[in-house]
Amino acid sequence: MDAVIRGNDVIFVLKTIGVPSVCRQNEDPRFVEAFKCDELERYIKNNPECTLFESLRDEEAYSIVRIFMDVDLDACLDEIDYLTAIQDFIIEVSNCVARFAFTECGAIHENVIKSMRSNFSLTKSTNRDKTSFHIIFLDTYTTMDTLIAMKRTLLELSRSSENPLTRSIDTAVYRKKTTLRVVGTRKNPNCDTIHVMQPPHDNIEDYLFTYVDMNNNSYYFSLQRRLEDLVPDKLWEPGFISFEDAIKRVSKIFINSIINFNDLDENNFTTVPLVIDYVTPCALCKKRSHKHPHQLSLENDAIRIYKTGNPHSCKVKIVPLDGNKLFNIAQRILDTNSVLLTERGDHIVWINNSWKFNSEEPLITKLILSIRHQLPKEYSSELLCPRKRKTVEANIRDMLVDSVETDTYPDKLPFKNGVLDLVDGMFYSGDDAKKYTCTVSTGFKFDDTKFVEDSPEMEELINIINDIQPLTDENKKNRELYEKTLSSCLCGATKGCLTFFFGETATGKSTTKRLLKSAISDLFVETGQTILTDVLDKGPNPFIANMHLKRSVFCSELPDFACSGTKKIRSDNIKKLTEPCVIGRPCFSNKINNRNHATIIIDTNYKPVFDRIDNALMRRIAVVRFRTHFSQPSGREAAENNDAYDKVKLLDEGLDGKIQNNRYRFAFLYLLVKWYRKYHVPIMKLYPTPEEIPDFAFYLKIGTLLVSSSVKHIPLMTDLSKKGYILHDNVVTLPLTTFQQKISKYFNSRLFGHDIESFINRHKKFANVSDEYLQYIFIEDISSP
């Protein structure tokens, strides 16, 4: 190497930031000066408030420099963290520089690492609120062009590193005519913080990147190609705004149309001249037209529009490309279709192969962290900051405008790891399950190894269920309704009727409830009796709100309606609870519409009593009777003499513990799916059993005895008048006393007196103050000859 290149002890400095180029080239003593190292040290000592910035005097003639870095972290690290971070920092940057030097400069990888790690100086900032330093690798030399070419490599390192010091490398210093503040000097006269020397290096030349003193331990490398030739294969960086948006901005600047606009792409836009159709004067300089075309270049994260030929004949225009990274991250996450807005204004997210919804947890933040490693490196590092994650989350919420309809797959049962098709038994996981958007699931993982018919658990479970609901001819209808009701709890659709589990104490009702809860877990909810006895849509009602999208709702332990003061079951509530949407809001919330997919089961020891009975109510009630009693040995004899029980079985004291430990979870789930295919494919069916409710007996029978009178009955009036009917206002009517006489032939007044009176009070009309009548005709009076 030439001796001139091997040494430089003249340090060229600028006396302030922003020295004009002319003053720099002319070496105006007001703005620039050159020092020997000892002279520079004396100058700083004599002028403690001076501002000096080291730079190359003439980069064209001499551009040998030491490898240097400027690190500026907006946080103060304690001593232990700092020592750990600086050690990792040296290893990371030396490896990075060595790889670049080997690839682009033909340097020996091990020699670069050895020279960098063996000798370097480190300054320390006096600013206690931040961690800032300059590091000079004293025996590692290169050219300024090489450092500029290395800028992209160091930028990628800083973006991908977990080390806070590496992430804080200022790559902007790697440019033409770069400057670096001299140790011991201020940034500006009003700034009292400086960089100070640290042992073992106490000579100022050890802190100057333009000082060159090569020796046997030094290592030098430089680019094998020109800097201009080091153009990346793809110019467009992920951090830029989209190429389409950038070119549209360029087009708007010209106003005149670009004829070859469609020929431009991310790889050729810097080499293809722009062909302008000058319908109007040039928008940049107002000239009528130009002889030479305009062209684009990519510099400093911006598109530069310039004219070829004489560049001074038209203005240069800069189009910045810095996109909002946090906005771009939000857009990329939205593009994965992993966050959706529901009709209720809630957000559901796709994490770990399942849709998750919980308004009390920051699920979008969890999604951002889980998807971080799938994003480009320059984005993933941004998400390590909690503040930036919150910004991304806010961007995602703001960008979600259109809501989607969820939970529209009634024959699909969601799990934490996928979706089970109830019809064909297929289990979908991963992207195959993603299309089945849902806000609720069972909350546990499906295990196909346990979802089998032949297992010890299944054998035990079948015996338990056969004890609760025996497979006998007498109990056949009851057992069928039992299976239909429980299997309907898998279906995510509105059910047409409510089911009462009716029986004395210790007959298996609670055991059935616990088995069902174990099998569908989070799709099951237990609620209070108020949904049956209180007004539903009056004030906050968390019981109703908790029913939203649940597939099974259990209401346990109704009161003894024979007791005075006990509220009866409201028939209006029964009707509302079989509607697709139930009104009721949680406390401190405005969400009142709850989608009703639940099979509502009421287990009770007492006969249900309703405030009002009509046909609409009777179409909505089914009853499953439980007549097997599970008794302890001491009470078995008494139970066997109780007419309320068909059978008496010994109580299994350990059964509850097994159910709570989910021993029968997958066995019972298998049975439910089997029953579902038996009864509810292709259509989910639940039929009422009003004949099982004693209070419905009168209304069921009277519907077969009476019809409402109408105009078509008037021609029959000759015969009807002989049977006590009269014509009033052109309508065939039956006087009240006559009706009471006729109805007594069918109903015992002692047993059904209250029902008869209620029917009369509801339907009677007044001819005058004393005469009352009903607009009904007994069917036998119009069917008999």
From Swiss-Prot:
GO cellular component: host cell cytoplasm
InterPro entries, per the entry: DNA_primase/NTPase_C, Helicase_SF3_DNA-vir, Phage/plasmid_primase_P4_C, Viral_Helicase-Primase_Cplx
Record keywords: ATP-binding, Helicase, Host cytoplasm, Hydrolase, Nucleotide-binding
One Pfam family named in its UniProt record: D5_N
SF3 helicase domain residues: 477-639
Primary location group: host cell
GO molecular function: ATP binding; helicase activity; hydrolase activity
Binding site residues for ATP: G503, E504, T505, A506, T507, G508, K509, S510
Domain of life: Viruses
Cellular localization per UniProt: Host cytoplasm
Enzyme Commission code(s) on record: 3.6.4.-
Catalytic residue positions: D170
Region (Primase) residue spans: 342-469
Job of this protein: Multifunctional protein required for genome uncoating and replication. Major viral uncoating protein that is required for the release of the viral genome from incoming viral cores containing the viral DNA genome. Possesses an ATPase activity that is required for hexamerization and uncoating.
Assembly and interaction partners: Homomultimer; hexamer. Interacts with OPG148.
Family of this protein: Belongs to the orthopoxvirus OPG117 family.
Record protein name field: Uncoating factor OPG117
Gene that this polypeptide is encoded by: OPG117
